[in-house]
């Protein structure tokens, strides 16, 4: 199975943006989300990672636009941001997204996420954003600003609840072009049988190939944002490179 690359489209107030370490107010705009999505589709993407940052930060929603864009695409979409209850989950799935990522609610509502996983199976992935604090990996919620508990305890709980996939982000790496935290990603992959989507820090093509080496350990995909928007390498180059790995 070929390693999957998901170009990221982060949306704020109807614009495609990138943030530095996920912090509100650090947005850099890259045009419209539809333009970005169609560009990545044209360049060969099979999946796209869409983030509604306004919903994630509890300051509005880009839902209608997201649904419209998903409807115009021929590729699979993973959708995340502000999905915290049945209503927002069903609305996200109604866009036609193949997969929905849940972050804060997976940390704060253990019974609800267990029920969502049971009902929707592989359509649900859990977004685990972490930051190293006093030597311990702590999960982050509410747009990455609140503490959500010890990483390994959260992972064990969600694993036992049957979570089909985890998206793992080292917050300190996100949007920094400083390289992924390969060691952390491998440790998380070793602690669960569910596949891992790596996120945060990709800066050069070698970073993608480094992660792809650990496909047999459970890291089967990577989300790439700023590196593509800042032209550090092209999506075509990345897809061709992982294709060669087989």
Curated annotation (Swiss-Prot):
Its main location: cytoplasm. The active site is at 10 (proton acceptor). It holds the Pfam family His_biosynth. InterPro entries: Aldolase_TIM, His_biosynth, HisA/PriA_Actinobacteria, Isoase_HisA-like, Isoase_HisA-like_bact, RibuloseP-bd_barrel. Pathway: Amino-acid biosynthesis; L-histidine biosynthesis; L-histidine from 5-phospho-alpha-D-ribose 1-diphosphate: step 4/9. Gene3D superfamilies: Aldolase class I. One of its GO terms (molecular function) is 1-(5-phosphoribosyl)-5-[(5-phosphoribosylamino)methylideneamino]imidazole-4-carboxamide isomerase activity. It is found in: Cytoplasm. Keywords: Amino-acid biosynthesis, Cytoplasm, Histidine biosynthesis, Isomerase. One of its GO terms (biological process) is L-histidine biosynthetic process. GO terms for cellular component: cytoplasm. CDD domains: HisA. It catalyses: 1-(5-phospho-beta-D-ribosyl)-5-[(5-phospho-beta-D-ribosylamino)methylideneamino]imidazole-4-carboxamide = 5-[(5-phospho-1-deoxy-D-ribulos-1-ylimino)methylamino]-1-(5-phospho-beta-D-ribosyl)imidazole-4-carboxamide. It comes from the Bacteria. Its EC number is 5.3.1.16. The keyword Isomerase applies. Belongs to the HisA/HisF family. This is 1-(5-phosphoribosyl)-5-[(5-phosphoribosylamino)methylideneamino] imidazole-4-carboxamide isomerase. It comes from Corynebacterium glutamicum (strain ATCC 13032 / DSM 20300 / JCM 1318 / BCRC 11384 / CCUG 27702 / LMG 3730 / NBRC 12168 / NCIMB 10025 / NRRL B-2784 / 534).
